[in-house]
Amino acid sequence: MKQDVIKFDNEIYQIDVFMENKSGRMSCYYIDSSNPMLVEVGPSKSFPYLISSLESLGISEVKRSAMTHLHLDHIGGIGHLVEKYKEHFVYIHELGIRHLPNPEKLWKAVSDVYTEEWLSTNWGEIKPTPTKNIRSLQDKELIDLGNGRKLEAIYGPGHAKHHYTFYDEYSKTLFMGDTLGLIYPHGDFVQPNLPPPDFNKELLFNTLDDLKKLD
């Protein structure tokens, strides 16, 4: 299975999960600290690529993940991850506690935009995630990465009302989800990401202003 993994400084790995079977469409991130963290999982159809890349790094178990928001291109594979690693738990906006165990409403909302056939073909169906495997995030919550390293959860609506950005102060890295829009690896074009019904321009600009204040 094809793999595309980039190692950055401070033990951060970018993993291309070949969303829609194309490179450069969706990345997940693995922070290989003493208390590791996976950021994003991608859609269900991309799950085999994620696992293959993790195993190529010698990672046989993933105990924790953090999701920026509840859109299926970012969280669709969570149920698969929990099925594979029974003790795994995911940090996510509090709405995740309602929707991940019963993802039918998430599926319906997205299929109204993309159609069920397109979703099934390109992203794959989402599996339920048991409530016991879900941790709801609080704004400014600090998640322990070990050895004094923390991942800060920063609530940042605009793209979606359930959106968080994660800040690793140790490496000065922001994991921004869709806050900045769609940024492709080969070119300077940035496409705003404006999904119905949650997109709010004013809130998005407020979020960006807040993030600019980070050290």
For each predicted feature, which ranges?
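Active-site metal-binding motif and surrounding structural segment of the metallo-beta-lactamase
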Residues: 47-95
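Short histidine/acidic/glycine/proline-rich micro-motifs that form metal-
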Residues: 37, 95-99
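Conserved beta-strand hairpin/beta-sheet module of binuclear metal-dependent hydrolase folds
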Residues: 2-56, 166-176
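Active-site environment of divalent metal-dependent phosphoester hydrolases
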Residues: 46, 70-75, 98-99, 160-163, ...
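Active-site neighborhood of phospho(di)ester-bond hydrolases with catalytic His/Asp-centered motifs
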Residues: 39-42, 63-69, 91-93, 156-158, ...
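Glycine-rich phosphate-binding loop signature in dinucleotide/nucleotide-binding domains
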Residues: 57-60, 145-149, 214
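Metallo-beta-lactamase
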Residues: 7, 100-157, 161-215
